[in-house]
């Protein structure tokens, strides 16, 4: 079940998975799992570097075809909260491949798009199932980012199911 609701400047999506909380945690914190599901339909993630600890950095490359041709987008950030199997919070900024933060407008983002946003993932153990609440603060609820997250979480559910762990 996916529900999207949000304040004006945040995307909030709640999703339940038929999988243990530690598996869902690994989907967010292990690069090989993250690469398998992150991004909208048609996107691939060739690079995912994660130093999952408070103050640790992350660098992710998202590639996709667009009407204007192939696009490669890099995102960098820092982990602010890491509570294993419970809560993960990190910042996210558009960057170059070296993790240098770029102006969002340089990457075609709309005027007023913040240079840094925050992603929070909260997990609740439901006895073999997991409830996840994703909050991406700093982007409007009706932005393309909301649709991108919805697609990514559908891919996440399929990847979790493919693991065959219940």
Q: Would you name each region that the model predicts?
A:
Residues 12, 32-74, 78, 166:
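Short beta-edge strand/loop motif at the mouth of beta-sheet-based domains
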Residues 31, 58-62, 100-108:
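Short Pro/Gly-enriched beta-strand edge/turn motifs at strand-loop
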Residues 1-45:
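Hydrophobic ligand-binding cavity/cleft-lining segments
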Residues 24, 34, 58, 79, ...:
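Hydrophobic pocket/interface hotspot
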Residues 153, 157-164:
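Short amphipathic alpha-helical signal-transduction/dimerization elements
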Residues 8-14, 21, 57, 74, ...:
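Intrinsic-disorder/low-complexity, polar/charged segments enriched in Ser/Thr/Lys/Arg/Asp/Glu/Gln
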Residues 81, 86-150:
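Beta-strand/loop substructures that line and gate deep hydrophobic ligand-binding cavities in soluble
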Residues 5-7, 52, 69-73, 111-115, ...:
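A generic structural micro-feature
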